[in-house]
Amino acid sequence: MPFLDKVKQQYEDWTRITPSNLLYDRALLLLFFVLLLIGLLAVSSASIPVGTRLFKDPFYFAKRDAIYVFLSCVTCYLCVQVPMEKWEQWHVRLFAFAIFLLILVLIPGIGLSVNGARRWIPMVLFNFQPAEFAKLALTCFLASYFTRKYDEVRSRKLSAFKPFALMGLMGLFLLSQPDLGSTVVLFVITFGLLFIVGANFWQFVGLMAFGGLLFVWLVLSSAYRLKRFTGFLDPFKDPYGTGFQLSNSLMAFGRGEWVGEGLGNSIQKLEYLPEAHTDFVMAVVGEEFGFLGILVIVILLGLLIFRAMKIGRESLLLEQRFKGFFAFGISFWIFFQGFVNLGMSLGLLPTKGLTFPLISYGGSSLIIMSMTIGLLLRIDHENRLMRIGQARLRDD
């Protein structure tokens, strides 16, 4: 089709490696900025009622989110300046620091407890969530480990025990908060990288079965988790109890229909939908911008994930395994977290405290996610330099 051919040509022109755009992936950077701006707009609208009630300022959270967006852009820029070899050298220190933070947050008087969960460390501008840093640290550690043990992981049956044991250590501290959602994200990152590495088939199947059984046990062993897990099956059975969040989220999507009620016209955000600007921000987006608004965000995030996976594939083709595994780990992380958040809001999955990447309100989530974008830009930059160097050698 001529139209699709034209779109494809425009995309190839935009992302082609030429001296004028050698330094960065323009498509990835544009997607990053657009999602940040959409997130700022969504949070500004969704947080008006709660900002008015708590601080007598309807734009209290919007102002703070604008600060987080600025800090995220600065963080992304700083990460682009750091060579990937430094991250590979720091993988053990990053992992150890993440464990330290996960222990620190559990100490009474240091960790901030909200709704029975101790997940945050109070800081000047925001409450830092160590779980977000743990995801980045584990991804970096696994990328380095699988680079060094590549042949061993592909051939030996028990070679994945060490990375899963270390992931389990992080998971143990996360479950103590409790934070099952972040624990599952760590498992998905680990499992996804094992798939990319090409781990032994039976080892792969065994770990998947073990992870599934462990998840079932964790759900069944806690009455609170079991209620949340079963509540999504029929949220209207107990609309003022376990199904309160989900029933209001579904009503928000229902009111939005195809094109939404318009910016600022959400009814469910008026104290009916808890966490409207954080975990359930997509429900407010669905109510105000409808199915088409949700579709646009999903497409944008999908394109960002596609770029991340393409960068990972290019790294592996250039035999840069650490960069490739790091990029793939980031793509699995972003995909799964976005999938779970949207699925949770739509009632397809149990409610979990996972933010939607680059959209939901939260300083820790935005800044750490922006670090991953900076890392992807750096990996792509180094890949481009390497390919240009190889091309010049062939020409000579």
UniProtKB/Swiss-Prot annotation:
GO molecular function, a single term: lipid-linked peptidoglycan transporter activity
Top-level taxonomic group: Bacteria
Keyword rRNA processing: no
Keywords: Cell cycle, Cell division, Cell inner membrane, Cell membrane, Cell shape, Cell wall biogenesis/degradation, Glycosyltransferase, Membrane, Peptidoglycan synthesis, Transferase, Transmembrane, Transmembrane helix
EC number of this enzyme: 2.4.99.28
Subcellular locations according to the entry: Cell inner membrane
Cytoplasmic topological domain: 1-27, 86-93, 144-157, 307-323, 377-396
GO cellular component: cell division site; plasma membrane
Function per UniProt: Peptidoglycan polymerase that is essential for cell division.
Record protein name field: Probable peptidoglycan glycosyltransferase FtsW
Species per Swiss-Prot/TrEMBL record: Pasteurella multocida (strain Pm70)
